[in-house]
Each structure stands twice: as C-alpha cells, then as structure tokens.
Amino acid sequence: MAKVQPKNKAELLGIIEIAINSYSSNCDLNFIDTSLVTDMSDLFCGLDFNGDISCWDVSNVKDMSSMFMNSKFNGDISCWDVSNVQTMEGMFCGSKFNGNISSWDVSNVITMNSMFFGAKFNGDVSRWDVSNVKFMRHMFCDSVFNGDISRWNISNVKSMIGIFCDSPLMNKKPEWYSDDESDLLELLMKR
C-alpha cells in the first residue's frame, strides 16, 4: 500500500476510520506517514483497534492525551520517539495496553494526570526521566501497576493527588511520596 501523509489529526482520523472499516480493527496502519501530525489526543479512544502502528513517526506529536483511553490496543509502540510530547494525560486510562514502553523519552512531558488510571499496564517505567512533569494526579489510581518508580525525580511535580489510590502501590509507596500535598512542598524544599 502506498504511503499516505495526513497533515493533521482530522485527516489522520479519517484515514484510520476508512482503513478499519475496509480491513479490520486489527489492520496494519504503518502505511500512514504521521510525521506532520502534532495532536494525537483521543485518536483510538474507545476503539476496538489492536492493529500495527509500530512504525509510526510520532516525533512531532505534542499531545497524546487520552490516545488509547478505554481501548483494546496492546500493540508494539516500544520504538516510538515521544521526546516532544508534552501531555500524556489519560493516555492509557482504562485501556488493555501492557506493552514495553520502558525506553520512552518522556523528558518533555509536563502532564501525566490519569495516564494509567484503571489500566492493565504493569510494565517497567523505572528509568523514565519525569523531572519536567508537573502534574501526576491519579496517574496510577485504580490500576494494576506495581513497578519500581523509587528513583523518579519528582522535584517539579506540583500535584500528585491520588497518584496511587486503589492501586498495589498504596502498600509500597516510594520514599518521595507524601499522602498530603502540603507535605510534598516540604519534601521538595529539603532536596
């Protein structure tokens, strides 16, 4: 199939809809050159899609909020260059995704609110550079995530209300965690 290059999210959504309707929800979408797209928010939100998007060029994307929210997607996106993404809010919220994203460069992300809220994700994110993240509210709330994030640098986080509520991490919180956000300010001032 010939490469197709959408200029924006609206064009990309149209191409995805046609491909899924023509082939199946498990189709290969790597024929789409996504290098011009900067907004992928809500792209697969609520869809049954579980096809191949492993070769997508997402290097210019800034917004991935709710991209896979409540979706069945569980494909390989381990090689994605997410280094320019600024918001991943709700990206995998309520999704089935449990793939390898351990090597993602999230150093420019500012918002991770509800990123894995209610999600099946339990992968390794221990080496993520979250030093620029400011918002982690409900990030792992009601999820199965039980990984090691003890080395995360949360020095710029302004709010992490409910980050671990109803999750396995409630019982093994990292040393940097505080139940009270007013304590968080004190914790950060000691650093």
Predicted regions located by residue number:
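Negatively charged
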Residues: 1-191
